[in-house]
Amino acid sequence: LKDKKYDQALKAANKALDKTPNHRGAMMCKALVFISEKKYIEADKVLTNLIIFLEKNLEDDDKTGIGTLAAAYANRGIIKDRNKNYEGALKDYARALGIDHEAVAGPGLGTIILNYKFKSSSVRERALYLNEQLQLPEDERVLSIEELDAGQVMHKPGKL
């Protein structure tokens, strides 16, 4: 996935899902491939199914699962953000932060320096910004800046 070999990543995810239908890592991988390919409808469907599955089956002491659930909400928020559904994005960002704020803190400084032209906002920063902007009259809102939004990163729990 990190090497942008999306076809291979999707095949591996589907193979894992054939063996274990609700494999959360494979579901997240599949969603991240779809987001990377701008297939937002498909990504949203996978993330929503992952969220439903995790909310029904997650144990309180499953830190990886909790991080995956937070990342699923954060990534679904990113999709909504990119589709200009800012209220929906804010709800998903807030849910992600409430579940596990550390899991969606964003990339470290080294990753930013090596990979991004602009510093990507964290889920927390984006949620605060959206909340602030949504309080303003519609004609005063600045909800999207294409150049900065392009650098928004997806959230990957653990290694995918």
Mark where each language-model region is.
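Alpha-helical tetratricopeptide repeat
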Residues: 1-160
